[in-house]
Swiss-Prot record:
GO terms for cellular component: HslUV protease complex. SUPFAM superfamilies: P-loop containing nucleoside triphosphate hydrolases. It is found in: Cytoplasm. It holds the Pfam family AAA_2. ATPase subunit of a proteasome-like degradation complex; this subunit has chaperone activity. The binding of ATP and its subsequent hydrolysis by HslU are essential for unfolding of protein substrates subsequently hydrolyzed by HslV. HslU recognizes the N-terminal part of its protein substrates and unfolds these before they are guided to HslV for hydrolysis. It comes from the Bacteria. ATP binds at V29, G71, V72, G73, K74, T75, E76, D261, E328, R400. GO terms for biological process: protein unfolding; proteolysis involved in protein catabolic process. This is ATP-dependent protease ATPase subunit HslU. PANTHER family: ATP-DEPENDENT CLP PROTEASE ATP-BINDING SUBUNIT CLPX-LIKE, MITOCHONDRIAL-RELATED, ATP-DEPENDENT PROTEASE ATPASE SUBUNIT HSLU. Belongs to the ClpX chaperone family. HslU subfamily. Keywords: ATP-binding, Chaperone, Cytoplasm, Nucleotide-binding.
Length: 450
């Protein structure tokens, strides 16, 4: 059964948990427990917004710990969830961080990056709202360059019509545009400096403000290129930057989702690595505690509270166990969800059912060369069989194994497709066997190829 897009009845609180699960089913196979957990977490956010009085601030999100091997859908569930709600979503690996005082990124940069995403989201929406006015102003600036500021309204109307019809797209003009060349080498962070905790120190911004940031330069360019540069410039002038920043901070604080992957790699196992490494891992966990529990992080846009940001942590936990995390951190991730390893049936469903399944992707790619690529049911079963075999014998990387198998399977077809226009190619089990059986039976080779 193929997952299809459904139109739902309007609910004042957005999608219901069952609707969220149905939406996730369009892209992700199985893992019902994990889908259910994130759907409830998302709905509880909407419920919290409708609670009145002081009680609303006391209701905090129940953060989630996903436990499962690589390639079973942990990241995809969180990513699709964020897209579903248009929430600012930030994914990071726990191994990227070091304890404060060591060289490397500190955990507060998570919130700074999340706010940056929220600001860009709000800016994009605001620019869409002012697009018509910005386009009008851009055309006026181009007309000034083409016919001069003192030209008659009749002349301007004639040229405006030509611009709108695209007749002047390849006409070269000389026009003043904002100088976006970075002054003083752009952005960087200075470890241990106050600026590092406030966000990124940008020398260009600092020097620009000191000298006056409205610097322009005259450039020669085609009308169509000028439109592409000037419309965003005019949009920036029309939107209320302070309002955007306030809305973005509010969006990040109340709807932000942070996905921390590989959290098992910072768990202290007591036997792996040197003592210093253990201390550093524990330090990162301790730095994460206030962030997940709720604190205020200073960013270049202003202070951001993390109390109502939803944190989803995940890890394979092959060597370490969830109980190896600091007890305080375990307590801040109260919902635990175990994701199942993928079976042969799951692999078959992954190849066929999602709206953006791999089979559909490869068929579409080869289809651009006017070649009709078709997969027989026997081929799908054989591919799934090989994926499970290699995962068991070499290393379990879940659904990601299908990518490497399909790339090897279709290598010759992808190479020769441009010379096969108008042809129909059917992939069956014999074709799969001919292409892959030698690699599958030689496990030493499979380790390197698949």
């Amino acid at each position: 059964m193929k997952a299809t897009k459904t139109t739902y009845k309007k609910d004042p609180m957005g999608l219901t948990p069952s609707q969220i699960v149905n939406e996730l089913n369009r892209f992700i196979v199985g893992q019902e427990k994990a889908k259910k957990a994130v759907a409830i977490a998302l709905r509880n956010r909407c419920r919290r917004k409708r609670v009145e009085g002081n009680l609303r601030n006391e209701i905090v999100p129940k953060n989630i710990l996903m436990i499962g091997s690589t390639g079973v859908g942990k990241t995809e569930i969180a990513r699709r969830l964020a897209k579903l709600t248009n929430s600012p979503f930030y994914k990071i690996e726990a191994t990227k961080f070091t304890e404060v005082g060591y060289v490397g990124r500190d955990v507060e940069s998570i919130i700074r990056d999340l706010v940056e995403i929220a600001v860009n989201t709000k800016k994009t929406l605001a620019k869409m709202e002012v697009d018509i006015n910005a386009r009008e102003k851009a055309i006026e600036r181009i007309l000034d360059s083409l016919v001069g500021k003192t030209s008659s309204s009749e002349t301007r109307e004639k040229f405006k019509e030509k611009i709108l019809n695209g007749k002047l797209d390849d006409t070269e003009i000389e026009i003043s545009v904002a100088d976006t060349t970075p002054v003083g080498g752009g952005s960087f962070e200075i470890p241990g400096m106050p600026g590092a905790s406030m966000g990124v120190l940008n020398l260009g911004d600092m020097i620009g403000r000191a000298l006056g940031s409205s610097k322009t330069k005259t450039k020669k360019m085609l009308v169509k290129d000028a439109m592409a540069i000037i419309i965003p410039e005019e949009s920036e002038k029309l939107i209320d930057q302070e309002k955007i920043i306030q809305q973005a901070i509010n969006l990040a604080e109340n709807d932000g989702i942070v996905f921390i992957d590989e959290i098992d790699k910072i768990a202290s196992t007591g036997s792996s690595g040197a003592k210093n490494a253990e201390i550093s891992r524990e330090g990162v966990q301790r730095d994460l505690l206030p962030l997940i529990e709720g604190t205020t992080v200073n960013t270049k846009y202003g202070p951001v509270k993390t109390d109502h940001i939803l944190f989803i942590a995940s890890g394979a936990f092959h060597i370490a166990k969830p109980s190896d995390l600091l007890p305080e951190l375990q307590g801040r991730l109260p919902i635990r969800v175990e994701l199942n390893s993928l079976t042969k049936d799951d692999m078959i469903k992954i190849l066929l059912e999602p709206e953006t399944s791999l089979v559909k992707q490869y068929s579409a790619l080869i289809g651009t060369e006017d070649v009709h690529l078709e997969f027989a049911a026997s081929a799908i079963e054989k591919i799934a069989d090989y994926a499970i075999t290699v995962n068991l014998e070499v290393e379990d990387i879940g659904a990601r194994r299908l990518h490497t198998i399909l790339e090897n399977l279709l290598e010759d077809i992808s190479f020769e497709a441009s010379e096969m226009k108008g042809k129909k190619i059917t992939i069956d089990d014999k074709f799969v066997e001919n292409q892959l059986s030698k690699i599958i039976t030689n496990l030493d080779l499979a380790k390197f190829v698949l």
